[in-house]
A protein has these predicted regions:
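Bacterial N-terminal signal peptides
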Residues: 1-5
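Beta/coil-rich, acidic/histidine-enriched accessory regions frequently appended to metallopeptidases
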Residues: 12, 222-296
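Surface-exposed patches in mature extracellular/periplasmic domains of secreted proteins
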Residues: 59-72, 123-129, 147-155, 206-212, ...
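Acidic/His/Gly-enriched intrinsically disordered linker/tail segments
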Residues: 106, 125-196, 201-203, 209, ...
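Boundary at the C-terminal end of the N-terminal hydrophobic targeting segment
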Residues: 7-14
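Juxtacatalytic substrate-recognition/specificity segment
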Residues: 18-124, 128
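Sec-exported extracytoplasmic/periplasmic mature domains
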Residues: 54-62, 118-121, 141-148, 196-204, ...
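Soluble non-cytosolic domains of exported or imported proteins
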Residues: 39-51, 102-107, 126, 130, ...
């Protein structure tokens, strides 16, 4: 979940006290962590924060912000129970973690990677939250797979199951005007998938979506600044040399854009079978499929 850089709310509270400094992904992360609240102690949680930062830094070519504060809030039970990202303090994440969370649950967690990805994009405003949430939803699995934290099969399986949630329903008025959960998260992710494929196709594999996102992050500095969404797409397209983002946005912002997902999976060479995922390397977009998970 992303909260605008300027937002004030009771949930934010007073400025957090940084309990320790963790060196990770080339930056110093100030971590507020009540050690005694967690049965496993602080080390698994610190390793989780470092691992998540390394995953995001690998995808973006560097960590998205120059500094970061993370507050770990203890909750009942086990598992990671959600997080919120702010543009304050140069980048600030509050994440809720169960007191009895096991190491294995932290290794498999997606929440903190999702939140750290939010740091990379300028604040584009609430009407365009589909872009920030869509990027985080789409990039999380790919970035983790590139670092061996998740299998490629699992990522494509989730996309096949969940991308239909992002398709427009009756009464849809485009991504900028339809603020349902499905359109915000998976509609945004579907936009990213389409853009990623098209960038790779039109540049003959030279560039991918990550190159556009890296350029946006480098020029803006990420969540700490406000940008109009049009500037995001202009900078991203300039970096890859093709106007994919601007063209796709023009089609999807004010009207329902509903790609044929079954046809898309066939072109990518992805098939879900009872025994697991099967990949067809003779499919028309098999090269683009492999490149997405390999990265640049």
């Amino acid at each position: 979940m992303l909260i605008a850089a300027w937002a004030q709310s009771p949930a934010v509270g007073a400025e957090p006290a940084a309990g320790r400094v963790l060196q990770a992904a080339g930056i110093a992360i100030n971590v507020d962590l009540p050690d005694s609240e967690f049965t496993g102690g602080p080390q698994p949680l610190l390793a989780w924060i470092k691992r998540s930062a390394d995953i995001v830094a690998h995808y973006y070519g560097r960590f998205p912000t120059r500094e970061l504060r993370v507050t770990v809030i203890p909750t009942g039970g086990s598992g990671v129970h959600g997080g919120t990202t702010f543009g304050r303090y140069g980048g600030y994440i509050r994440v809720r973690v169960g007191r009895e969370t096991a190491d294995a649950q932290l290794v498999e967690d997606w929440v903190l990677v999702h939140e750290m990805i939010h740091l990379a994009l300028p604040d584009v405003g609430e009407n365009h939250s589909w872009l920030s949430e869509g990027i985080s939803t789409y990039v999380e699995g790919i970035a983790r797979a590139q670092m061996g934290n998740r299998t490629i099969e699992d990522v494509w399986s989730e996309q096949m199951r969940s991308m239909p949630k992002g398709l427009p329903q009756a009464g849809d008025r485009g991504l900028d005007n339809t603020h349902t959960w499905g359109r915000t998260y998976w509609g945004g992710a579907l936009f990213c998938l389409q853009a990623d494929i098209e960038i790779r196709r039109r540049t003959h594999g030279r560039y991918g979506l990550e190159d556009a996102l890296r350029a946006v992050n480098r020029e803006s500095g990420g969540i700490v600044v406000d940008w109009p969404i049009e500037r995001v797409f202009k900078v991203g397209d300039a970096a890859v040399g093709v106007a994919v983002l601007e063209d796709l946005y023009a089609k999807a912002k004010d009207a329902p854009l509903s790609p044929d997902l079954d046809a898309l999976w066939r072109e990518l060479g992805i098939e879900s079978q009872a025994e697991g995922m099967r990949f067809h390397d003779d499919a028309p977009l098999a090269g683009e499929r492999k490149a997405i998970m390999k990265g640049s």
